Curated annotation (Swiss-Prot):
Originating gene: hisH
Catalytic activity: 5-[(5-phospho-1-deoxy-D-ribulos-1-ylimino)methylamino]-1-(5-phospho-beta-D-ribosyl)imidazole-4-carboxamide + L-glutamine = D-erythro-1-(imidazol-4-yl)glycerol 3-phosphate + 5-amino-1-(5-phospho-beta-D-ribosyl)imidazole-4-carboxamide + L-glutamate + H(+); L-glutamine + H2O = L-glutamate + NH4(+)
Protein name: Imidazole glycerol phosphate synthase subunit HisH
Pfam families documented for this protein: GATase
Source organism superkingdom: Bacteria
Length: 213
């Protein structure tokens, strides 16, 4: 089936690298700058790099926030990437503005007592806690690339689908509920493993986007 994919452009995103990755998968996308651009879109990607409060301010300036809330409440397909994952939650310790609140929980600073350098930059393996459209059945093959100083703590443990090691602790790597999900790492910068994740997501969309339990 033909898939109309929207990439949200709000001045905080790694748009070019995501676009190039999608091109390699033979999938085009439309940039979403305002609510009019949502017409005819089947699924959205919310990318992001930077800080929480400026990101929410930029999203509000586009007028997209109420439309994204309705999109999530209607359980339409949405994929957050990096900061895009954090914006799906209710609040962040990085700022004072509320997030979108499509997923319950809070974003907290990575633990300094872990002994690891912050920001966390580099490759890490995934530990699966459930299934979702991004993940393969072979967790050992999934090393992915992270750049972040904060991580989400979901209220509902069932929303956590994968974590990654940070020092002696595990931090959130993938969250998913229904058709709304996100990854803290950058799949578009995670070589073959990340590309295969996006390919699985696109296949899931084309096959009808069955909600994830």
């Amino acid at each position: 089936m033909s898939l109309n994919l929207g990439l949200i452009d709000y001045g905080m995103g790694n748009l070019h690298s995501v676009e190039k990755c999608l091109e390699r998968l033979d999938q085009g996308c439309s940039l979403i700058n305002n609510s009019d651009d949502l017409e005819g879109i089947d699924a959205l990607i919310l990318p992001g790099v930077g800080a929480f409060d400026p990101a929410m301010a930029n999203l509000r300036a586009t007028g997209l926030v109420p439309h994204l809330l309705r999109w999530g409440q209607e359980d339409r397909p949405l994929l957050g990437i990096c900061l895009g994952l954090q914006l799906l939650f209710e609040q962040s310790d990085e700022g004072s503005d509320p997030g979108l609140g499509l997923l319950g929980g809070r974003v907290t600073r990575l633990p300094s007592k872990s002994g690891e350098r912050i920001p966390h930059m580099g490759w890490a393996p995934l530990k699966h806690h459930g299934t979702c459209p991004l993940l393969s059945s072979d967790a050992s093959s999934e090393w992915v690339y992270f750049v972040h100083s904060y991580a989400a703590v979901p209220t509902d443990r069932n929303d956590l689908k994968a974590s990654a090691p940070f020092g002696d602790q595990e931090v959130t790597a993938v969250v998913w509920r229904g058709r709304v999900g996100a990854c803290q790492f950058h799949p578009e910068k995670s070589s073959d493993a990340g590309e295969q994740m996006l390919k699985r997501w696109l296949t899931w969309l084309r096959n009808g986007a069955e909600p994830c339990p």
